[in-house]
């Protein structure tokens, strides 16, 4: 378990930062993960799903990540799941087996507390101990600035922009671009895989 402290804005510095911890997700966390994701599906544009998956669907997705040996993390404070992050296969074809994609979702009431950056940093650290060589982020961005925070967090943690698909999605009455970012894990392409 990793401990971190929530960031605070200048106006909030009169109160002590609220610590949160990062840990491996368990099946017991899936209902909270489902609630966080369902909110983003219904009200946001980060996910291109338009109908929230069922709890059974989320349990199956969780199990698939775990069966592949990929990390699935939650941030929690006093037993409450505040956000989650996981790595999944970037694509299903076998030549992509050393490339993974990150996904991070934060409870909409907790955005701006440093959870996303802490989760991503821990996810990267975990993935660098595995066989994977590249991490890809697929980030939804709108003309109104949605996605800018995720782009900034990824950039701070070593990702670089490698492409942009313009107007690749349409959700909640707005066109959405997809920005592709990439980060080397471990030796990257400098050595052949074992």
Q: Where is each model-derived feature located?
A:
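Acyl-donor-binding surface of acyltransferase catalytic domains
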Residues: 1-17, 155, 183-185
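Conserved acetyl-CoA-binding loop-helix of GNAT-fold acetyltransferases
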Residues: 112-127, 148-156
């Amino acid at each position: 378990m990793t401990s971190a402290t929530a960031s605070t804005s200048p106006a909030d510095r009169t109160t002590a930062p609220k610590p949160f911890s990062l840990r491996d997700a368990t099946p017991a966390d899936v209902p909270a993960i489902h609630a966080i994701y369902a909110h983003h599906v219904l009200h946001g544009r980060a996910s291109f799903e338009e109908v929230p998956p069922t709890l059974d669907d989320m349990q199956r997705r969780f199990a698939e990540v775990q069966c592949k040996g990929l990390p699935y993390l939650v941030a929690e404070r006093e037993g409450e799941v505040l956000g989650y992050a996981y790595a999944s296969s970037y694509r299903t074809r076998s030549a992509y087996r050393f490339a993974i994609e990150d996904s991070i979702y934060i409870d909409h009431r907790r955005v701006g507390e440093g959870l996303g950056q802490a989760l991503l940093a821990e996810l990267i650290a975990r993935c660098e101990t595995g066989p994977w060589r590249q991490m890809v982020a697929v980030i939804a961005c709108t003309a109104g600035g949605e996605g800018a925070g995720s782009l900034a967090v990824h950039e701070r943690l070593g990702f670089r922009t490698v492409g942009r698909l313009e107007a690749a999605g349409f959700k909640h009455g707005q066109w959405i671009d997809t920005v592709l970012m990439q980060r080397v894990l471990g030796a990257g392409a400098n050595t052949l895989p074992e």
